[in-house]
Structure formats: C-alpha cells, structure tokens
Amino acid sequence: MPQTVSFTRMKDGTKEDYALIYAAERRHAEGLVDRVLDALRALRPKEGEGMPLQVDRMEHCLQCATRAYRDGAGEEMVVAALLHDIGDELAPYNHCELGAAVLRPYVSERTYWIVKYHGIFQAHYYAKHVGLDPDARERYRSSPHYADCVEFCEKWDQESFDPGYQSLPLEFFEPMVRRIFAREPFMSDRAVAESAADA
C-alpha cells in the first residue's frame, strides 16, 4: 500500500507530509505529456459521434500545427496550434480557456493569450450566420497580442478543415510537445501577481 499523509485537514499537515505530496506531484507531472497527447487523440470521434465537419477535430489540430510549422512559426507556437482545441472534449463552451490553462506554465504570455482568446477571434468567420457579433474580437484591439491572434486564426485555425490537406502526423510533433512541456514551469510568479491583483 502506498505511503499516505498523516492529516485529514491540510492545516494539520507536517513538513514530512508535504514532502511526500510534492514527491508524488513530481512523479505525476512526468506523465503530463502523455496525458496531453491522449487528450488530443480523444478528439478523434467514436463511431457515430463527432461534429459534421469534413475533418475530425484531431485532424483539424494536426492541420493547424502543420500550417504553423510550414509557415516557419516557432516551436512554442506550433505546439500551441497543435493543442489549441484540446479542451473541446471536457469544456465545449470554454475550450479555449482550458487549452490555454494547460499550456500556460510552459509558454509565453503571448502564446497563452492567443490560445485563450482564439475562439472569439475565430467567431469572426461564422458569427453572422448564428446570430452573434462577428466583430466581438474588437474589444481586444488594444491588446499587444491582437494582431497575432488575428493571424493565428486567419492563416492556420480557420484554414484547417480541409480533407485534401496533407498534414504531418502526430508523431512528428510529439518531440516538440515534449520539449515545451520539459521547460521549468514559470507559473509561480504569474500566479502570485494575479492573486494579488484579484485580492
């Protein structure tokens, strides 16, 4: 049986308890890339399921990443393009935020922002057909990342629903994903700053 902590309330935990927890968290984090790639694979629909698109959502992500790669985007952005929709299965109404949250500790503020807001920017292409505002992205025009998000959607995201496009396989991108997620997570300073701002 695995070793467990002594407490039933966190405030009663000891230094040894928290050392045990942190060691387990480090071991768990080692499998993160495999879980992220599994989440991407889960975008392949089961028989009789899926969206009525000409490609499934995993293929859409592969096309988006392939286009970014072939356009000479940096590795971080290629990985973001690959993973931008991984939240679709668990968070269909806020998938952008979930995907961005997964990437956030490992990517720049720019990349995080693009993934977080790409859904609003992507709506520019279809909103008028479903009774939404196609210019909703304009509320973010003052962001230093606005033009980059427009470009992400225009060149890669909205283009990537083509059954005739020759995308690269997931195996091509896996080493890139592993390198990005091997970075030292730099969320702590950002999290502290945001907690202070929210207080």
Where do the language-model regions lie?
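Metal-dependent phosphohydrolase cores
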Residues: M1-L82, I86-A199
